[in-house]
């Protein structure tokens, strides 16, 4: 665009940024999962929660102080709605508590274990539970039961889930009164959004054969500042034992405009090889 050309032709250009979405997940868990719930709106689609097919914004509903006429969230159509993850039926009260606790239960066709869980609640309207119970069972016997207090719509639960074949999530209280429970996305593992403060360096290479006798090869390497020592093999509660190939790595390039805003441009999507080098201090990891 003309604006982009004008900005990039300046003698002194504004800084650029890199953002990487990376984590340790179980890529086979969605295939084994069978999610159910205890009540939902007609356009709710619980089956899409763990496969990444939800819509970027939620529909407007007649919940108090939620119906905002800003054009960002559309009304649900009478036919052919866009299914957008889990949208519960029960609305919380004046104090944010639910009389009937919204429940999402996921049964697995085999035993699974996770280094943690990553939840995406309602980003578009800022709705999330500020009291949230996670229960894991193995053959109907409880092996994990904790109540948390999330403080954001994109929330990582970093406690390890032991071997189990059933997960249950209970919405106990909403951060905003008179709101439904919503869950747009669930990842079986820990997914971090790495920014400039977390990345020490990164590089991208691409090999293309001019005769097209070989498949093009593209590699992306990055070094992160691992202050929590998640990838340190000497950390018994870290993620080292869960590292494997086929972990998705999404990276974007950002350019800062003169008004201070940052435009993010998709750079690439690749998958990890499972290799990770950690410095002697355990504070820097190269992936």
Language model features: what each stretch is:
Residues 1-287:
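Assembly/oligomerization scaffold segments
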